[in-house]
């Protein structure tokens, strides 16, 4: 499924799906990580996504996790609680038709997702919760407590901090 570029689209920066456009949910619901920021983040972690198991816990459009998939991730878990956002994320994931078996989609509250998946181990974790949530440290501690992080796991964390 190909999309033309418009204000509500972002693109995959590199890898197998370089240049593929992805739909973006309404900006009142999510804050999509823009192309240049994603490029800088993935350049900083270099080949960490190669062969990795990735969790994008507040996935929104799924762009961060799908970028990791495009760069060689073995398995990508995309989760978002918001139903309308999940529908867009699923559509974006399904547009990568050759990789559907590598993408696991969930429409759960982050706490439910974590509790149901304590048996998983992740190499790359993306935490970018909705505005005003300051929960990333608690999530990381939970994942450490249940050994959900591989020894050399990388965590990308973005959140607002109160002034």
Residue map of PLM features:
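Class I S-adenosyl-L-methionine-dependent methyltransferase catalytic core
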Residues: 2-163
């Amino acid at each position: 499924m190909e999309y033309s570029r418009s204000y509500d689209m972002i693109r995959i920066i590199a890898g197998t799906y370089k240049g593929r456009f992805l739909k973006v949910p309404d900006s009142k619901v999510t804050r999509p990580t823009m192309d240049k920021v994603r490029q800088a983040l993935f350049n900083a972690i270099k080949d960490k996504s190669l062969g990795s198991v990735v969790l994008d816990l507040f996935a929104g459009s799924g762009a961060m996790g799908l970028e990791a998939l495009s760069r060689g991730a073995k398995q990508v878990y995309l989760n978002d609680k918001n139903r309308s956002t999940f529908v867009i994320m699923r559509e974006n994931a399904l547009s990568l038709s050759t990789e559907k078996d590598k993408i696991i989609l969930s429409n759960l509250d982050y706490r439910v997702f974590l509790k149901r998946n304590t048996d998983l181990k992740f190499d790359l974790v993306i935490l970018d919760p909705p505005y005003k949530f300051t929960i990333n440290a608690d999530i990381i501690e939970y994942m450490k407590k249940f050994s959900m992080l591989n020894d050399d796991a990388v965590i990308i964390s973005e959140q607002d901090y109160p002034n």
